[in-house]
Swiss-Prot record:
InterPro entries: Ribosom_uL1_bac-type (IPR005878), Ribosomal_uL1 (IPR002143), Ribosomal_uL1-like (IPR023674), Ribosomal_uL1/biogenesis (IPR028364), Ribosomal_uL1_3-a/b-sand (IPR016095), Ribosomal_uL1_CS (IPR023673). It comes from Klebsiella pneumoniae (strain 342). Keywords: Repressor, Ribonucleoprotein, Ribosomal protein, RNA-binding, rRNA-binding, Translation regulation, tRNA-binding. This is Large ribosomal subunit protein uL1. GO terms for biological process: regulation of translation; translation.
Length: 234
């Protein structure tokens, strides 16, 4: 058996894997145990009561967290004419059509989010093999294919998170940085859970949000007692 590092030994001693923690206690634990030499992200895993093998029970979408994620986001937009000008005014770093597609084909991908107006999808469609595996392909379900590209750019810059369940029915995303105030992390988590509840597939039966765990980039997961969260998020 591999020897635990000193840091992991401390985490194992502090975190009771069988316990669901009050959200305030959970956040306090994360802050106490976040000893990496960089500001760690706070990540969340939400186990959903869905059958991920069935396409009509998969959950996918996006929501803007009230306090953002703490990340600086670079946005690329496929648009032309007035839409292109609006995207630039909203703060998009890269805006174009065929010229932007050519950059991407050359491997120049200095961006975190790709947004496209519907009329630009004829160009973006050529990039599926490049953008798809990186999770960057624009999609109307998460608001990245839209006639209102300026609003989409503003949302991305404001701390929008995209979510999609994995094959085990678990959503993985981030809700901020460990140096955020505890109240801000809590409110971001509640906002995410509200969005997930709204996205509940009609075919999903039984308990929908089965388990919520939060962790830092380098830390262990801490299970959260949903009773301590905003009732509308449960």
């Amino acid at each position: 058996m591999a020897k635990l590092t000193k840091r992991m030994s401390v985490i194992r001693d502090k975190v009771d894997a069988t316990k669901q923690y009050d959200i305030n206690e959970a956040i306090s634990l994360l802050k106490e145990l976040a000893t990496a030499k960089f500001v760690e992200s706070v990540d969340v895993a939400v186990n959903l009561g869905i059958d991920a093998r069935k396409s009509d029970q998969n959950v996918r979408g996006a929501t803007v967290l009230p306090h953002g994620t703490g990340r600086s986001v670079r946005v690329a937009v496929f648009a032309q004419g007035a839409n292109a000008e609006a995207a630039k005014a909203a703060g998009a770093e890269l805006v174009g059509m065929e010229d932007l597609a050519d950059q991407i084909k050359k491997g120049e991908m200095n961006f975190d989010v790709v947004i496209a107006s519907p009329d630009a999808m004829r160009v973006v469609g050529q990039l599926g093999q490049v953008l798809g595996p990186r999770g960057l392909m624009p999609n109307p379900k998460v608001g990245t294919v839209t006639p209102n590209v300026a609003e989409a750019v503003k949302n991305a810059k404001a701390g929008q998170v995209r979510y999609r369940n994995d094959k085990n029915g678990i959503i993985h995303t981030t809700i901020g940085k460990v140096d955020f105030d505890a109240d801000k992390l809590k409110e971001n988590l509640e906002a995410l859970l509200v969005a997930l509840k709204k996205a509940k597939p009609t075919q999903a039966k039984g308990v929908y949000i089965k388990k919520v765990s939060i962790s830092t980039t380098m830390g262990a997961g801490v299970a959260v007692d949903q009773a301590g969260l905003n009732a509308s998020a449960n």
